[in-house]
Amino acid sequence: LYRPRGDGAAQDGSNTWSQVSKLADRIAHERALRDNVCIGEVRVTSPARTLVDCALLYPFEHVLSMFDSALRRGLVTREEIVAVCDGLRVDCGPVFRLLHYADARSENGGESFCRAVSIEEGFVPPQLQHTFYSRVTGKEAGRVDFIWHTEDGRIIVLEFDGMQKYIDPEMTSNRDVRQVVRDERQREQDLKEAGVSVVIRTNYIEVVQRAPFVMKLMQAGVPRAGAHPIFEHAD
């Protein structure tokens, strides 16, 4: 044991806890400054620091899209995000969870949100953006948002539909809603002929409500995390 002197130093010449704390605060402050960047005359946080801050403030399902998008656009690397965490004196568990599930192949925020909710509800993370080909002609049968393989050999596909696909002329190619629906059904048939067992369709409202979305996944037999360890990590 030792008694601190009035100047803050211990009698044995070592630093007191007060000095150590001040030093740590200074290091953290200097690290925070390095995490800032200037755009013109405006100082903003770097992409990596912004992602970390959001991960620590907001729910997983609302932040996964940010991580997916930043990785897809090449705004940040996983190593940069980890480096920010190394300089903080807080529990960065939520950040590392997001890094574990983040995937640059996710093409939009709706898909990321859908995937995040499925993970939160205990389902195995799906593979993303898989293309199927006809077993007969070899031609492309369709590119799907999400895919799961089950232990019994079934292939489950999930399509996340935004309302824009039915009303936006750029997405409908000027087809009316009835034609879009007919083409959608034909696409599902093509996918099944290419080996898909089940095609699930969902939308933003169902995912927000959760119960209808979860029921569809359960009825289709989407594997649960922990039940089939070899399928817990999407390729």
Predicted segments, located by residue:
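Phosphate-handling catalytic interfaces
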Residues: 1-115, 124-125
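Surface segments flanking catalytic/ligand-binding clefts of nucleic-acid enzymes
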Residues: 71-235
